Amino acid sequence: ADAIVIGARIIGTAVALALSKAGRKTIGVDRAPKAGYGSTSSSCAIIRVHYSTLEGTAFAFDAYHDWEHWSEYLGPNVLANLEVARFHETGALVMKTEGNGHLKNVVENVRALSIPFEEWGEEQITQRLPGYDLRCFAPAKRMEDPAFGEPGAGRIAEGVFFPTAGYINDPQLASQNIQVAAEAVGC
């Protein structure tokens, strides 16, 4: 083997597939009985393109296109008789807060990479998401705190909407889809 990939979760199976597609003889190993067990199977499967570093943002946006075109990513003849994970592109609204630097760095990153985003004010947030509570609940409180769930001072005034965000319906199944694709190209 040219490479041994340890871990058959979403990252490990994707690495094995990429190496196999590049012509490397690859072996994937995991102590679990199936791909996608472990932390991947318990993840919330959020797909997002907004990160604090330019490199992380670029990597995530590249991966977004794989999720968007899942069958092409997996390769020809992989989908026959196979249940396939689905990407639900819902978009994501991230609030600008003091704690996240009002997303200044994140907005710079997505702007530099021409990733779609919209900056929303309070009026647009409540128009697009009726019933959204814009009271500030920071700082975080432990559940044992009598003030848990009570608003703090101030309001959220702005957010950034990323239309390319969403979620995968089944992260374990997504790992298993990639495993099948990797096996189809010789892993």
Where are these regions (language model features)?
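Dinucleotide-binding Rossmann-like beta1-alpha1 core, especially the glycine-rich loop
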Residues: 44-146
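Glycine-rich FAD pyrophosphate-binding loop
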Residues: 20-40
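Short beta-to-alpha linker loops that shape the active-site pocket of alpha/beta-hydrolase fold enzymes
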Residues: 32, 125, 178
